[in-house]
């Protein structure tokens, strides 16, 4: 389902959360287009947390702690990075209204960022929405090789430790397939989402955000879930 909302200003962070609970998320045609439209894909991308894959080469990079990884320390800067052109992604769907809405969710504690730093510079990261025991990955970026991949590894470790059950990637790309992402039909996705939203919520900050874990610790957490 794609339905255009010409009055994007009527969407609030609270409305956005209710939409996520129904399996719907907003997008914009471009950064210059002020309108938003709702999306509910027939096939939904997910990464099963029990089947998250890390290549041997990436595992070596993660263990080396080549990047300093932080959480919720530079949310706005991560959104800025995600809005930059990337190889294979020259245009961005992150417009001003998207920035405002997700910044609002961040203020409410329902949006989080993972950052990768090198020599004091932000070189990669990702952000997404948490609701119940579901995490909805929104976007990622990198300015240094493997930075966004390392951020994803640390995110998955945090989700597992925090009791999350569903990692929604919205769509599946060739890049995400290398981590185990798969497409599932809408009906199956709806069932997984309903389960993840029933009962106690997960805790994104169960792992301290003041003392981030090492790459070796992150990989150990992921290995325990397999």
Curated annotation (Swiss-Prot):
The keyword Acyltransferase applies. It comes from the Bacteria. GO terms for biological process: protein catabolic process. One of its GO terms (cellular component) is cytoplasm. It catalyses: N-terminal L-lysyl-[protein] + L-leucyl-tRNA(Leu) = N-terminal L-leucyl-L-lysyl-[protein] + tRNA(Leu) + H(+); N-terminal L-arginyl-[protein] + L-leucyl-tRNA(Leu) = N-terminal L-leucyl-L-arginyl-[protein] + tRNA(Leu) + H(+); L-phenylalanyl-tRNA(Phe) + an N-terminal L-alpha-aminoacyl-[protein] = an N-terminal L-phenylalanyl-L-alpha-aminoacyl-[protein] + tRNA(Phe). GO terms for molecular function: leucyl-tRNA--protein transferase activity. SUPFAM superfamilies: Acyl-CoA N-acyltransferases (Nat). The keyword Cytoplasm applies. It is found in: Cytoplasm. Pfam families: Leu_Phe_trans. Keywords: Acyltransferase, Cytoplasm, Transferase. Its EC number is 2.3.2.6. It is an enzyme of class 2 (transferase). Belongs to the L/F-transferase family. Functions in the N-end rule pathway of protein degradation where it conjugates Leu, Phe and, less efficiently, Met from aminoacyl-tRNAs to the N-termini of proteins containing an N-terminal arginine or lysine. This is Leucyl/phenylalanyl-tRNA--protein transferase. It comes from Bradyrhizobium sp. (strain BTAi1 / ATCC BAA-1182). The gene is aat.
